A protein has these predicted regions:
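Extreme N-terminal basic, low-complexity initiation segments
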Residues: 1-13
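Short amphipathic alpha-helical "recognition" segments used for binding
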Residues: 7-10, 18, 276
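Alpha-helical bundle regulatory/interaction domains
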Residues: 17-222, 232-237, 251-256, 260-271, ...
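Hydrophobic alpha-helical segments, especially transmembrane helices
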Residues: 223-224, 243
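DNA major-groove recognition helix of helix-turn-helix
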Residues: 229, 241, 280, 292
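Functionally critical mobile loop/hinge segments
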Residues: 281, 286
């Protein structure tokens, strides 16, 4: 597959569960990345591109207790864990009752805090929303803002996958098993063309497309559009567009050494900087300035862990 990157082995901690999952950890990982989000319709697919963001196998022998934060994204993670449970909570700090092992989590228009109390060993499949709908063949409203244990699905394929991954001797072997499973499960399935149209329009416009225009193009009412989007993605088109615009702001901020928040707000079609701040508080749980400060610290830790720190 020409769109698949080489598998790399690093002491790495980037872009895991979503934007910031693993950055505070000294983690060994191997990852396969797939192509971008563009979706050719139809069932004659030879690639997982557009259905799977990537697959990562993580391992660490020891870990100091830590809490990391995931901000709103378009990743639907499937986690198969081989070690201690995580503690995970939406829009708050996780408590003792928030433990979970292997799970799937749908889209969430907010942030998620993840706590680790012991060693981490897992395989993570990052599905796109379109890929997740095909993978589970169930309405994505069943997963939105939820952590669903994999055992709850009573899915023979998932149980077999978990067993094979658990028996695998290396991270590379786990990746090969996961790719083969995804190809069997996803390739050959027809993508819902109307869901793909809505998804592509929102992503291509970075959240600025008028939802009324989409309903007109499809010949639907607003009510029908909202119902179809909730089934396909787990949230309404308007909410999807807000997250897409927020993600565009994140991309611009990450590409700048010192983000110009007023300029970013204008470039992302926010009404003003206060509007941008409101979305950051909703989707990241903190102000843009606080988010920027925290991510800079995390990048510095990552560079220290990989030996890529600035020369002193």
């Amino acid at each position: 597959d020409a769109e698949r990157a080489d598998v790399v082995t690093t002491a790495w901690a980037g872009s895991g569960f979503a934007t910031l999952f693993w950055w505070d950890l000294d983690m060994n990982a191997e990852r396969i990345r797939f192509g971008d989000w563009r979706l050719p319709c139809g069932s004659n697919r030879a690639s997982l591109s557009g259905l799977v963001h990537g697959i990562t196998a993580y391992d660490t022998a020891t870990i100091n207790p830590a809490v990391d934060r995931e901000i709103a994204s378009f990743v639907v993670p499937v986690i198969v864990s081989f070690a201690d449970p995580f503690r995970i909570a939406f829009d708050r700090g996780p408590g003792a009752d928030d433990r979970i092992g292997s799970f799937v989590s749908g889209l969430h228009p907010g942030y998620v805090d993840i706590a680790y109390d012991g060693p981490v060993s897992c395989l993570q499949i990052d599905l796109t929303p379109i890929g997740a709908r095909l993978f589970f063949r169930r309405p994505m409203t069943e997963f939105a803002t939820r952590l669903v244990p994999l055992d709850d699905f009573h899915d023979h394929g998932l149980k077999e996958l978990s067993a094979k991954l658990g028996d695998a001797a290396t991270r590379s072997e786990r990746l090969r098993i996961a790719v083969a499973f995804l190809e069997r499960r996803l390739l050959g399935q027809a993508i819902d063309p109307k869901a793909a149209f809505v998804w592509s329009a929102i992503r291509r416009s970075r959240g600025t497309v008028r939802i009324d225009r989409l309903t007109e193009d499809l010949g639907w009412s607003r009510k029908r559009m909202a119902a179809h989007a909730r089934d396909a993605f787990g949230m309404t088109p308007k909410r999807l567009a807000r997250v897409a615009r927020f993600q565009h702001a994140i991309d611009l901020a990450q590409s700048a050494q010192r983000p110009d928040w007023a300029g970013i707000a204008a470039a992302c079609n926010y009404s003003d900087q206060a509007h941008l701040v409101r979305d950051f508080n909703a989707f990241a749980g903190e102000t843009p300035a606080r988010w920027s400060f925290r991510t800079q610290l995390q990048r510095a830790k990552q560079n220290d862990n990989t030996g890529q720190g600035a020369p002193g």
